[in-house]
Protein backbone atom coordinates (compact mmCIF):
# COMPACT_ATOMS: atom_id res chain seq x y z
CA UNK A 1 0.00 0.00 0.00
CA UNK A 2 2.81 2.41 0.85
CA UNK A 3 4.48 1.75 -2.51
CA UNK A 4 1.19 2.37 -4.30
CA UNK A 5 0.67 5.72 -2.57
CA UNK A 6 4.27 6.74 -3.24
CA UNK A 7 3.96 5.89 -6.94
CA UNK A 8 0.69 7.80 -7.23
CA UNK A 9 2.19 10.87 -5.55
CA UNK A 10 5.18 10.71 -7.90
CA UNK A 11 2.92 10.56 -10.96
CA UNK A 12 0.74 13.42 -9.72
CA UNK A 13 3.68 15.63 -8.70
CA UNK A 14 6.26 14.87 -11.40
CA UNK A 15 3.82 14.14 -14.24
CA UNK A 16 6.01 11.59 -16.06
CA UNK A 17 5.25 11.07 -19.73
CA UNK A 18 6.97 7.71 -20.11
CA UNK A 19 7.49 4.67 -17.90
CA UNK A 20 9.33 1.37 -18.22
CA UNK A 21 7.90 -1.53 -16.26
CA UNK A 22 10.02 -4.63 -15.70
CA UNK A 23 7.81 -7.67 -15.21
CA UNK A 24 4.62 -8.90 -16.82
CA UNK A 25 2.77 -10.61 -14.00
CA UNK A 26 -0.50 -9.60 -12.34
CA UNK A 27 0.90 -6.66 -10.38
CA UNK A 28 2.92 -5.40 -13.33
CA UNK A 29 -0.06 -5.45 -15.69
CA UNK A 30 -2.35 -3.75 -13.20
CA UNK A 31 0.27 -1.05 -12.74
CA UNK A 32 0.66 -0.67 -16.51
CA UNK A 33 -3.11 -0.30 -16.90
CA UNK A 34 -3.32 2.39 -14.21
CA UNK A 35 -0.39 4.36 -15.61
CA UNK A 36 -1.78 4.17 -19.15
CA UNK A 37 -5.15 5.45 -17.94
CA UNK A 38 -3.32 8.38 -16.29
CA UNK A 39 -1.82 9.31 -19.66
CA UNK A 40 1.64 7.76 -19.20
CA UNK A 41 3.22 5.98 -22.16
CA UNK A 42 4.19 2.54 -20.81
CA UNK A 43 6.68 -0.04 -22.05
CA UNK A 44 6.73 -3.49 -20.43
CA UNK A 45 9.98 -5.46 -20.54
CA UNK A 46 9.54 -9.17 -19.85
CA UNK A 47 12.22 -11.87 -20.05
CA UNK A 48 9.79 -14.67 -21.00
CA UNK A 49 8.17 -14.27 -24.40
CA UNK A 50 4.69 -13.85 -22.95
CA UNK A 51 2.86 -11.95 -20.23
CA UNK A 52 1.10 -13.72 -17.36
CA UNK A 53 3.15 -16.89 -16.99
CA UNK A 54 0.24 -18.98 -15.58
CA UNK A 55 -1.54 -18.71 -18.94
CA UNK A 56 -0.76 -20.86 -21.95
CA UNK A 57 0.87 -18.95 -24.81
CA UNK A 58 -2.20 -18.96 -27.05
CA UNK A 59 -4.30 -17.48 -24.25
CA UNK A 60 -1.64 -14.90 -23.39
CA UNK A 61 -1.80 -13.63 -26.97
CA UNK A 62 -5.21 -12.12 -26.22
CA UNK A 63 -3.65 -10.22 -23.31
CA UNK A 64 -0.84 -8.99 -25.57
CA UNK A 65 -3.38 -7.69 -28.10
CA UNK A 66 -5.39 -5.89 -25.41
CA UNK A 67 -2.30 -4.18 -24.00
CA UNK A 68 -1.14 -3.02 -27.43
CA UNK A 69 -4.65 -1.85 -28.30
CA UNK A 70 -4.41 0.55 -25.35
CA UNK A 71 -0.99 1.85 -26.31
CA UNK A 72 1.20 -0.27 -24.03
CA UNK A 73 4.42 -1.31 -25.79
CA UNK A 74 5.69 -4.84 -25.16
CA UNK A 75 9.34 -5.89 -25.22
CA UNK A 76 8.95 -9.63 -24.74
CA UNK A 77 11.91 -11.99 -24.57
CA UNK A 78 14.21 -9.17 -23.44
CA UNK A 79 16.28 -8.98 -20.28
CA UNK A 80 16.90 -5.93 -18.08
CA UNK A 81 20.56 -5.80 -17.04
CA UNK A 82 20.61 -2.52 -15.11
CA UNK A 83 19.67 1.14 -14.90
CA UNK A 84 21.54 4.39 -15.33
CA UNK A 85 20.61 8.00 -14.69
CA UNK A 86 20.70 10.15 -17.82
CA UNK A 87 19.91 13.74 -16.90
CA UNK A 88 16.26 13.90 -15.90
CA UNK A 89 15.54 10.44 -17.35
CA UNK A 90 16.41 6.88 -16.51
CA UNK A 91 18.06 4.49 -18.93
CA UNK A 92 16.88 0.89 -18.70
CA UNK A 93 19.74 -1.25 -19.99
CA UNK A 94 18.76 -4.29 -22.04
CA UNK A 95 20.84 -7.33 -22.88
CA UNK A 96 19.42 -7.76 -26.38
CA UNK A 97 18.96 -4.19 -27.66
CA UNK A 98 19.50 -0.48 -27.12
CA UNK A 99 18.59 1.12 -23.75
CA UNK A 100 15.12 2.53 -23.14
CA UNK A 101 14.72 6.14 -22.00
CA UNK A 102 11.90 6.91 -19.57
CA UNK A 103 10.82 9.31 -16.84
CA UNK A 104 10.19 6.51 -14.35
CA UNK A 105 10.94 2.80 -13.89
CA UNK A 106 8.95 0.26 -11.92
CA UNK A 107 9.96 -3.27 -10.94
CA UNK A 108 7.31 -5.98 -10.66
CA UNK A 109 9.42 -9.10 -10.98
CA UNK A 110 7.85 -11.46 -8.48
CA UNK A 111 7.81 -12.34 -4.82
CA UNK A 112 10.58 -13.96 -2.79
CA UNK A 113 9.89 -15.10 0.79
CA UNK A 114 11.64 -12.94 3.38
CA UNK A 115 12.08 -15.58 6.08
CA UNK A 116 15.22 -14.48 7.91
CA UNK A 117 13.27 -14.22 11.18
CA UNK A 118 11.94 -17.75 10.79
CA UNK A 119 15.39 -19.10 9.97
CA UNK A 120 16.94 -17.34 12.96
CA UNK A 121 14.20 -18.78 15.17
CA UNK A 122 15.09 -22.29 14.06
CA UNK A 123 11.92 -22.99 12.07
CA UNK A 124 12.13 -25.59 9.32
CA UNK A 125 12.22 -24.01 5.87
CA UNK A 126 10.78 -25.40 2.64
CA UNK A 127 11.17 -24.69 -1.06
CA UNK A 128 12.93 -21.46 -2.05
CA UNK A 129 13.42 -20.55 1.60
CA UNK A 130 9.70 -20.57 2.42
CA UNK A 131 8.34 -21.57 5.82
CA UNK A 132 7.25 -25.20 6.16
CA UNK A 133 3.88 -25.64 7.90
CA UNK A 134 1.43 -28.47 8.49
CA UNK A 135 -2.28 -28.41 7.57
CA UNK A 136 -3.01 -26.46 10.76
CA UNK A 137 -0.60 -23.73 9.53
CA UNK A 138 1.68 -24.64 12.43
CA UNK A 139 5.43 -24.47 11.88
CA UNK A 140 8.00 -27.04 12.98
CA UNK A 141 8.01 -25.34 16.40
CA UNK A 142 4.79 -26.05 18.33
CA UNK A 143 2.44 -23.09 18.86
CA UNK A 144 4.19 -20.93 16.24
CA UNK A 145 2.02 -20.41 13.16
CA UNK A 146 2.73 -18.89 9.75
CA UNK A 147 0.48 -17.88 6.86
CA UNK A 148 0.68 -15.97 3.61
CA UNK A 149 3.13 -15.57 0.75
CA UNK A 150 6.06 -16.85 2.82
CA UNK A 151 4.69 -20.35 3.46
CA UNK A 152 4.78 -23.39 1.20
CA UNK A 153 1.50 -25.15 0.44
CA UNK A 154 0.39 -28.28 -1.36
CA UNK A 155 -0.72 -27.74 -4.96
CA UNK A 156 -4.00 -29.57 -5.51
CA UNK A 157 -3.21 -30.58 -9.10
CA UNK A 158 0.39 -31.73 -8.80
CA UNK A 159 0.40 -32.81 -5.17
CA UNK A 160 3.77 -31.09 -4.85
CA UNK A 161 4.83 -28.30 -2.51
CA UNK A 162 4.46 -24.86 -4.09
CA UNK A 163 4.53 -21.13 -3.40
CA UNK A 164 1.16 -19.58 -4.27
CA UNK A 165 1.29 -15.85 -3.58
CA UNK A 166 -2.39 -14.95 -3.79
CA UNK A 167 -4.73 -13.10 -1.46
CA UNK A 168 -7.46 -15.76 -1.43
CA UNK A 169 -5.38 -18.63 0.00
CA UNK A 170 -3.67 -16.22 2.41
CA UNK A 171 -7.02 -15.06 3.78
CA UNK A 172 -8.15 -18.64 4.30
CA UNK A 173 -4.85 -19.59 5.95
CA UNK A 174 -5.17 -16.68 8.37
CA UNK A 175 -8.64 -17.75 9.46
CA UNK A 176 -7.53 -21.37 9.86
CA UNK A 177 -4.48 -20.40 11.92
CA UNK A 178 -6.61 -18.13 14.13
CA UNK A 179 -9.13 -20.93 14.66
CA UNK A 180 -6.38 -23.33 15.73
CA UNK A 181 -4.72 -20.77 18.00
CA UNK A 182 -8.08 -20.42 19.75
CA UNK A 183 -8.34 -24.16 20.32
CA UNK A 184 -10.08 -25.29 17.13
CA UNK A 185 -8.98 -27.96 14.67
CA UNK A 186 -9.22 -26.43 11.19
CA UNK A 187 -7.13 -27.62 8.24
CA UNK A 188 -5.75 -26.00 5.09
CA UNK A 189 -5.50 -28.75 2.50
CA UNK A 190 -3.85 -26.74 -0.27
CA UNK A 191 -4.61 -24.54 -3.26
CA UNK A 192 -4.78 -24.75 -7.02
CA UNK A 193 -3.78 -21.13 -7.53
CA UNK A 194 -6.99 -19.67 -8.96
CA UNK A 195 -6.65 -16.03 -9.98
CA UNK A 196 -8.47 -13.47 -12.11
CA UNK A 197 -7.41 -10.15 -13.58
CA UNK A 198 -9.41 -7.37 -15.23
CA UNK A 199 -7.25 -5.57 -17.75
CA UNK A 200 -8.80 -2.66 -19.64
CA UNK A 201 -11.77 -4.38 -21.37
CA UNK A 202 -10.48 -7.92 -20.92
CA UNK A 203 -10.83 -10.40 -18.07
CA UNK A 204 -8.15 -13.10 -17.79
CA UNK A 205 -8.34 -15.97 -15.33
CA UNK A 206 -6.39 -19.13 -14.62
CA UNK A 207 -6.55 -22.09 -12.30
CA UNK A 208 -4.50 -25.23 -11.81
CA UNK A 209 -1.47 -25.71 -14.06
CA UNK A 210 -0.68 -24.85 -17.67
CA UNK A 211 0.84 -26.81 -20.56
CA UNK A 212 4.38 -25.81 -19.56
CA UNK A 213 3.96 -27.45 -16.17
Predicted segments with their positions:
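Glycine-rich Rossmann-fold phosphate-binding loop(s) that bind the pyrophosphate
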Residues: 22-25
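Active-site-proximal substrate-binding core of FAD-dependent oxidoreductases
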Residues: 160-165, 169, 179-211
